[in-house]
C-alpha cells in the first residue's frame, strides 16, 4: 500500500478494492446527467420499464403491508412464497423443485453473488462466456474466484462450444456459467447444445451456474 493512499481507501477490503464500477450504472448515470442538462439522449444503459406497475400488483403489496401476518421477519421467507415459486417453476419450466431447495433473495445480483460465495474458494476459476452481463466477473472476484472469459462472436451466434469450454478448463476450474437466453446478446442454446455442455460439466465434476433473469 503506497503512502499516498488515503485513510478511507485503507479501510476498504482487498475484495472490494479488486472489483470495478458497474459499467451499466456508469453509462446510465451519464445519460441521466445529460438529460438533466437538457440534452436529447436515448439511453442504452440500465433497463428501466417506461410503464407503471399494474394495479393488481400494487394492491397486493399494499394488502400484504396491512396484514399483520406479514409483519414478522423470517430469514427463510414464508413457506407459501416458496411453494408458489415451486409451482410456477413446474408450470413454466416443466421441472419439479422441492420448496426446501428454494432460496429467495432481494434480486438477481444478490442471488448470483451468494451462489458464487457458497461454492468458490480463493483462486477457483469460473468460465464465463462473453459477451456477458457486467455483474458476473465482479461477483466472482468478490467471492474470491477468478473469472475466465471464453469469447463467442457472431460467427457462432454468440454461443460457446464444448470444445471452447474444454480449452479454457484447468485444474482450478470449478464452475461454468451458462446463460440462455444470453444477456446481452439474446442468444439461445439448442436443447442438444445445452445437454452437451451439461454432460461435459458432469464429466469433469464442475458446477453449472445458470442465470435466466
Curated annotation (Swiss-Prot):
It comes from the Bacteria. Homodimer. Its EC number is 2.6.1.1. It comes from Streptomyces griseus. CDD domains: AAT_like (cd00609). This is Probable aspartate aminotransferase. Keywords: Aminotransferase, Cytoplasm, Pyridoxal phosphate, Transferase. Pfam families: Aminotran_1_2 (PF00155). Belongs to the class-I pyridoxal-phosphate-dependent aminotransferase family. The keyword Transferase applies. InterPro entries: Aminotransferase_I/II_large, AspAT/PAT-like, PyrdxlP-dep_Trfase, PyrdxlP-dep_Trfase_major, PyrdxlP-dep_Trfase_small. Its cofactor is pyridoxal 5'-phosphate. It catalyses: L-aspartate + 2-oxoglutarate = oxaloacetate + L-glutamate. PANTHER family: ASPARTATE AMINOTRANSFERASE (PTHR46383:SF1). One of its GO terms (molecular function) is L-aspartate:2-oxoglutarate aminotransferase activity. One of its GO terms (biological process) is biosynthetic process. The gene is aspC. GO terms for cellular component: cytoplasm. It is found in: Cytoplasm. L-aspartate binds at residues 47, 133, 183. The keyword Acyltransferase does not apply.
